[in-house]
Amino acid sequence: QPDLMVYHDAIHDYSTNEPTMDGTACLTYYLSAMQKEGMKQAGASADKNVYVNGGIVRTDPSKKQISLVFTAADKADGADAIISTLKRHGIKGSFFFTGEFYELYPEIVKRLLNEGHLVGSHSYGHLLYMPWENRDSLLVTREEFEKDMLKSYEAMRKAGIEYKDAPIYIPPYEYYNKEIAAWAKNMGIQVVNYTPGTMSNADYTTPDMGQKYRSSKFIYNKIMEVEKKEGLNGHLMLIHFGTDNRRTDKFYNSYLDKLIKTLKRKGYTFTPILEAIGIKTNSAL
């Protein structure tokens, strides 16, 4: 996230000269066809997920399960550390990337897929949907939103990821409102977001942000504090896949491993997000 932004812990125009029925148009048709199936799968059993503004921010609170989710716009410095840590612990994570990321790091995407992780959308152009000071207004039209999402899924398709493998997405900046969630759902895509409270999403902050900066130790201790007070059942815990070079204290380098070990000792299981949400897929992922 850019420097001017404050992490939130509460709850491009696209044109083509190709023929009308291009890959994007085909994808529009495909997403529409898949929408009913995806929603049917999600509603197959009683929905115990927790929603905020139409997005899932927590899975079944009665289950001692945590889902690790990672987002990235254009940075991938955590790739080796994160992939190796998850592999060591036998955990399948969920990774949400922008279109730029898919274009910059195809080999990393391939690695993640080969390891059996879910790889999905973080939008194509990393658009800011609403002003930070007014969540109820919009900076994008529905048409702009849909074109951006279709372009995102086209980039995913080129990487070998079908819609059925990733019918969920984390919005850019982890920031959305009810209207965005409704537009996404109309396309057959469910918004998901991190569970607020632990401040794990503040792992991108840099020392020059002053009082807004959160060290890895602070974040780890905050997670443990929340666990002790109310538990982490059903939490979607977000960690950034890469952060600014000005942040040398990378959470994924040492604290991710420590966090997993500690929470496992406390009896938590790390559950793939689609399984935790209750969406079944025929994918090998």
Describe the role of every protein-language-model region.
Residues Q1-Q41:
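Aromatic (Trp/Tyr) and acidic
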Residues S45-S137, K151-P167, L259-T262, G278:
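Active-site beta->alpha N-cap acidic-glycine motif
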Residues E18-S32, D80, L150, K178, ...:
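A structural signal for well-ordered alpha-helical segments within the folded catalytic domains
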Residues E103-L104, L128-L238, G242-T269, I273-L285:
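Catalytic domains of cell-wall/extracellular-matrix polysaccharide-remodeling enzymes
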Residues A42, N53-G54, E230-N233:
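Feature targets compositionally biased, intrinsically disordered low-complexity regions
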Residues D9, L31, F70, S121, ...:
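Pocket-edge structural micro-motifs
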Residues S15-E18, D22, F70, V140-E144, ...:
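Short, surface-exposed alpha-helical recognition segments that flank or form part
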